[in-house]
Each structure stands twice: as C-alpha cells, then as structure tokens.
Amino acid sequence: MEDSQETSPSSNNSSEELSSALHLSKGMSIFLDILRRADKNDDGKLSFEEFKAYFADGVLSGEELHELFHTIDTHNTNNLDTEELCEYFSQHLGEYENVLAALEDLNLSILKAMGKTKKDYQEASNLEQFVTRFLLKETLNQLQSLQNSLECAMETTEEQTRQERQGPAKPEVLSIQWPGKRSSRRVQRHNSFSPNSPQFNVSGPGLLEEDNQWMTQINRLQKLIDRLEKKDLKLEPLEEEIIEGNTKSHIMLVQRQMSVIEEDLEEFQLALKHYVESASSQSGCLRISIQKLSNESRYMIYEFWENSSVWNSHLQTNYSKTFQRSNVDFLETPELTSTMLVPASWWILNNN
C-alpha cells in the first residue's frame, strides 16, 4: 500500500522484487508496507525492538509480544522478514482477507483518480471543477465514516479483552536506545514555529503556551533526573513534607522524546496539535508543555496527569492511539517515554 513517506529507488525495486518472489496473494502487499514502515534502520528485517514498537497495542504484555515474535520467526533468525509475516497472518485473516484485497484495489483506484485530477483540473470548466471537489469531499467523508466504524470496533474489542483479563493491562512502555537513526533526506525548509523561539506554542483555551514559570519547573525536574542517573550520587536527608491522609500526595509527570523525520515535520505538527487539543480537554490532564530543541527536529513533551490511573486510561483513548499510530510514520526512531511521580504540592503551589 502507498505511504506518503519517500523511498529510494533501490528500496522500491527491492520491494517489487520481493513481492514478485513471494507471489503475494491479493491484499497481502500490506505486509510489504508494514515491514517498510516498521523497519527503522532500513536493513530489510524486523528486530524484536522494531516489532514491539510497531505491534504493541497496550493489551498484550511484553512477554506475550516476545512469544508472538518467536512464533512468527519460523526461520529462527531473531529477525522477521516479509515472508514470515505473510505466512503467519495469512493463516488468521478470515473475512479480513477480502477487506485487505478491497483496500488494495481502493488504494490503486484513488491514486489513479487523483493523478487524473492533478492532470486535468486546471483546464477543466468551473462546473467540472465543482464536481471534482464535491466527489473528493464525499469520498473523504465515506472513508472517514468507515474509519470511525473501524475505530469503534477496535476500541470495543480491546476493552472486551481487558475486561476478560480482569482489569486494564499496563501498556508496553518503549524506552529503546537505537544505535543509529534512519537516514533521512534533510532539507532546509521554512519552520512554521516562531524563528525567535524554540518553544512550540499551541494557541487556544486550555492549551499550551510558553510559560517561563513552568519551563523552570520542568528544567528543575530534568536536572533532578540527570542527577539520579549518576552512579556516584549521594542522597542527603531533606526537610520532610508532612502530608495529610486525605490529600492526593503525587501527580504523574510523563516525559516523551520524539525525533521527527524532517520531511514529515508539518504533518507531525498537525497531528501533535490535534493530540494536545484532545488531551488537554480531559479532566485528569493538568497541563501539557512542549519544547522543540533548536536546530533539531526533536521534541520534548511534558504531560502532567492527576495520577497514573488517569494516565493509563488516557493511553487507551482513540485520540491517543491515533497519535501513536501516526508517529510510526513521522518519527525516525520510536519515541522514548519516561514517567515519574512528583509532589502534588508543587502543582498547588504554582497555581495559587
């Protein structure tokens, strides 16, 4: 299936050769696309870390993902190739075999129609241009309606599975150090952020703004984390903070690091904006702050939540999963996520 991300001629050729060699049945070309998108170091195969980054759904545990990986790895190489992916999933497609085949046809039909539109639209009459715009809009509406139905079904099945497991499973948290980054074609382009500020500001009620007070607090926390990572750290007694029993003593701070592919920067910014808008409207979300590192396509996202339960529930929401899925294409490497509990009194103090 097509993907907006560029691929090199050699990559396209190898995909075509592989598809021909495997004699893929109708609809199975999706697994060529899955391998290409999940293969972050472009070596033509999936390591367990790459497999986990792509397939983790917040329901299967790390152990279950590891077991699934080795079940698919019939060649016993500790890596997965397209043949192994196709061989495993083809045994479990059921009715989705027809769905994938239809998607393959639909993908080709839409690309053909858009190619025709690009070629003829400028010279068409006003009425013909109107019809083209109308058909594009209605096609999009139909696809969005189907997407909403699929997302509803996906949420229902995941919730049912969690209930059967007697409680929500803690999603697999990715914290992977990658030896190298996917080679991307770095191009100097206009940055839609303010050239005088490394901060990413999302305007609108309840959203982020550049806040020196909060950035100071965040920088303090970052320094604390850096200190805690040093082996020679010596802890000394500090002044005790006495907390009443009926007081919520801690809040959850989540730090997310994302390295964005330069060519996908604008699309990532739009997806991030939608994510922040949705997350900030949740009752358990106290605040979200975003930093963009200067001269890099790297973002630091800090999320403050009332507690870990609210955070885990947030991970299962539709908008959060949509953002996670889009990041598969937008990020050079899987995002790094870390969490820590901080005294709730900090929040109360800074908001009084």
From Swiss-Prot:
Residues 252-340 form the ABM domain. Ca(2+) binds at residues 39, 41, 43, 45, 50. One of its GO terms (molecular function) is identical protein binding. It is found in: Cytoplasm. InterPro entries: ABM_dom, Dimeric_a/b-barrel, EF-hand-dom_pair, EF_Hand_1_Ca_BS, EF_hand_dom, NECAB1/2/3. The modification Phosphoserine is found at residues 4, 192, 197. Residues 135-163, 209-275 form a coiled coil. One of its GO terms (biological process) is blastocyst hatching. Residues 180-202 are annotated as: Disordered. Residues 26-61, 60-95 form the EF-hand domain. One of its GO terms (cellular component) is nucleoplasm. SMART domains: EFh. Keywords: Calcium, Coiled coil, Cytoplasm, Metal-binding, Phosphoprotein, Repeat. Residues 190-202 have a biased composition (Polar residues). Its main location: cytoplasm. Interacts with STX1. May interact with CPNE6. This is N-terminal EF-hand calcium-binding protein 1. It comes from Pongo abelii.
